[in-house]
A protein has these predicted regions:
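The DNA-contacting recognition helix of HTH DNA-binding domains
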Residues: 23, 34, 44-45, 63
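DNA major-groove recognition helix of helix-turn-helix/homeodomain DNA-binding modules
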Residues: 31, 50-65
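A short, Lys/Arg-rich alpha-helix, primarily the initiator
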Residues: 1-18
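Short alpha-helical DNA-recognition segment
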Residues: 21-39
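Residue-level detection of the helix-turn-helix DNA-binding "recognition helix"
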Residues: 17, 31, 42-44, 71
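Short, charged recognition helix plus adjacent turn
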Residues: 1-5, 57, 65-73
Length: 73
């Protein structure tokens, strides 16, 4: 499970920064809070299915791309 959370965090941070979106702006856009995005990116919490779908839709990235399972770790 820890490997999955880390992969999600890295992918989310990468997509967000590539698009020059700060955590707070992303959080507002998806109806969350900046602390939640920060915690996901630091692997302190995992995203719920609902939050994952909102992130995917807003960032225009398939859920499968955003939530990558790195089985080698």
């Amino acid at each position: 499970k820890e490997g999955i959370i880390m992969a999600v965090a890295n992918t989310l941070r990468q997509v967000r920064t590539e698009r020059n979106i700060c955590q707070e702006d992303l959080a507002i856009a998806i109806g969350s809070c900046g602390r939640t995005i920060g915690r996901i990116e630091r692997s302190e919490r995992s995203a719920s299915l609902e939050l994952a779908l909102r992130l995917s839709k807003y960032l225009d990235v398939a859920v499968e791309e955003l939530f990558v399972l790195d089985e080698e770790k």
